[in-house]
Amino acid sequence: MRLLLGLLFSFTVATVVGLGATWFALTQGTAFGAIAIGAWTAWPKTGTASVDPYARAAIARNGELPIGSGDGVAFFAVEDDRGRLLDGRCDVTLAGTTPQARFWTLTLYDLEGQMIANSLDRQGFTSQEVVRNADGSFAIVVAPRARSGNWLPTGGAERYVLVLRLYDTPVGVATRASREVPMPSVTLERCP
């Protein structure tokens, strides 16, 4: 009887720990195979057959369709370069250049992965429509109120996620350092 109770207790503890670890990995995001460059994080293996089981479960849970590894990579930013969460009531500037890519998109989502409604019905920019400086760099202001130049409205969302998708790019699994890949800076400028 004592052996049976010990086995039952061990099984219960193992189940709770396993389910708890899985829940944590799915809700908090895991860094298995992640590339982190400044405020940007990408998981280049999500579009491959060798994706880790936690990422596979997160993809199934979110219902997203990841970019195939031969097509490109998606970088996500939920905070600025200093680690402050992106707030839709604040002005945030993305400045600099992107890694080499045939085409890129920058899109604004809420924390549930839905596009944020706003008065302009603009949720992002592409590499074809962004206004650039003479040196090829750009500055995009993500803010609740209209700004001149490249303005991406937040629609008053409290928190949001920026997604930079690079198509036909050499950035991938072998990329490890920010000196290898120039990513736009994410800077919190002003908050009410």
Cite the ranges covered by each PLM segment:
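A compositional/structural signature for long, glycine/proline-rich flexible linkers
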Residues: 1-192
